[in-house]
Every structure is written in C-alpha cells, then in structure tokens.
C-alpha cells in the first residue's frame, strides 16, 4: 500500500464530486489554511479539501533549522541554486495525492491544486507536468522554480501576489506570470495591498475562481 503524506481533510457539502489539494508555506503545516476553507463560500458544493503536512527537513536560509518544507531554500533571491531533489520528491508526493483522489472516484478535471509560497511552487510544478489536465492551480505569493517543471501542459491558474511582499517580491511573481502566459496558461492575475500573506478580498476571489473552475454554478 502506498504511503501518503499525512493530511488534514475537510469536506464541504456532499456527495463529494471534486477535490482541492492545498499546500502550505515554509515552516507551517496542513492546519495553516484550514480556517480559510469555510471562508471560501463553497459550503454548498461537494468538495474535499486535502491539506497535507510537508516533510521536515533542514532549511539552509534558516541556518539549517529542521522544519516543514517542500524543498530546501538556499537563498532568498529564489533563483540559481535550486533544490531539484527536494522539489522532485515533493512533486511525486503530491502526484500520489492526486492519484488517490482519482482512486476515490474524482475525475482529474475536478481536482484543483493550491499552494502558498513554496507550496505554490510545488502546486504549479505538479500541474504543469501532470499527464492528465487538472481543474487548475491557485498560486499564492509564489514563483515557478527553474527546471524541467517550468515547462509542460498549459493549465488554468489563479495567481495572486501582495504588492508589498518582502520575501517573494512582486517582481518574481510577475516573472512567473509571464512564464505561465508564455506556456499558454489560462491565467487570472491579481495583486493585493499586503505583504507575504493572504487577505479577505483575495480569499473571496479564490472562492469564486474555484467555484467556476470546478464546474459548479453558484447557487441562486
């Protein structure tokens, strides 16, 4: 039997007909975005939210401190020296979660990925290389790392970034936006007056985008 990442699961409505796999940022865990789920306004839909915990690993930029991380960060310019091994491992682990949802009867076109910061990097990397088209990706305050995962299948993307982000600067988000558009992605780009975080307006926009992307009309 396959071993999966430990996950928090929250079901909104029923029967379950779609799934969102949501990846947290560096140093957080699957509970980080759990309070966001009810705020998305999708209670009427049959959506299963899967919020996995990243493995623990040493993180170079944090003096080797062991924390939950999807891959090692060796610098804060988010360019150049990329932890390809860590990215490949996390991509494979998330792909396994997608396959599990397929095994639960969810069509690939009803599975969306979401991620914040380096969680968004993995979500984008999985969706662009996945053999079946997914419903789309919610990429928050993130960037697409250099490597083979920066090429592949065009997909629907909701990308959002804080204009005052001190960690992953807006320019890096804009570079990723341009790369995704060059790949032919159906991209929705939003900016918000905030730092490296999320805000209520953004959460409302994510909820509306997920509702449309999962193919379920809003209630009257």
Q: Model-flagged regions — what are they?
A:
Residues 52-53, 114, 138-141, 160, ...:
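Alpha/beta-hydrolase-fold catalytic nucleophile elbow
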Residues 18, 155-156:
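Alpha/beta-hydrolase fold active-site loops
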Residues 158-161, 165:
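Short beta-strand/loop motif that positions the catalytic acidic residue
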Residues 25, 117, 143, 163, ...:
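Residue-level signal for short, function-critical loop segments
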Residues 171-220:
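C-terminal catalytic histidine-bearing segment of alpha/beta-hydrolase fold enzymes
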Residues 102, 107-154:
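Primarily recognizes the serine-hydrolase "nucleophile elbow" in alpha/beta-hydrolase
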Residues 1-112:
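Serine-hydrolase catalytic machinery in alpha/beta-hydrolase-like enzymes
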């Amino acid at each position: 039997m396959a071993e999966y990442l430990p996950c928090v699961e929250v079901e909104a409505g029923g029967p379950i007909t779609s799934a969102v796999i949501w990846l947290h940022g560096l140093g957080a865990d699957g509970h980080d975005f759990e309070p966001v789920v009810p705020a998305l306004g999708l209670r009427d839909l049959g959506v299963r939210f899967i919020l996995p915990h990243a493995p623990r690993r040493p993180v170079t930029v944090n003096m080797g401190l062991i924390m939950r991380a999807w891959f090692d960060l060796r610098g804060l310019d988010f360019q150049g020296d990329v932890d390809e091994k860590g990215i490949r491992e996390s991509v494979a682990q998330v792909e396994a979660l997608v396959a599990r949802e397929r095994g639960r009867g969810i069509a690939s076109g009803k599975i969306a990925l979401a991620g914040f910061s380096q969680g968004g990097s993995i979500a984008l990397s999985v969706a662009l290389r996945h053999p079946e088209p997914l419903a789309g990706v919610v990429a928050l305050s993130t960037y697409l790392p250099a490597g083979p995962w920066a090429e592949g299948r065009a997909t629907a993307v909701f990308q959002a970034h804080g204009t005052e982000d001190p960690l992953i600067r807006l320019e890096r988000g804009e570079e990723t936006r341009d790369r995704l558009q060059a790949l032919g992605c159906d991209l929705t780009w939003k900016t918000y007056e905030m730092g490296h975080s999320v805000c209520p307006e953004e959460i409302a926009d994510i909820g509306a985008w997920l509702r449309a992307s999962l193919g379920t009309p809003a209630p009257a």
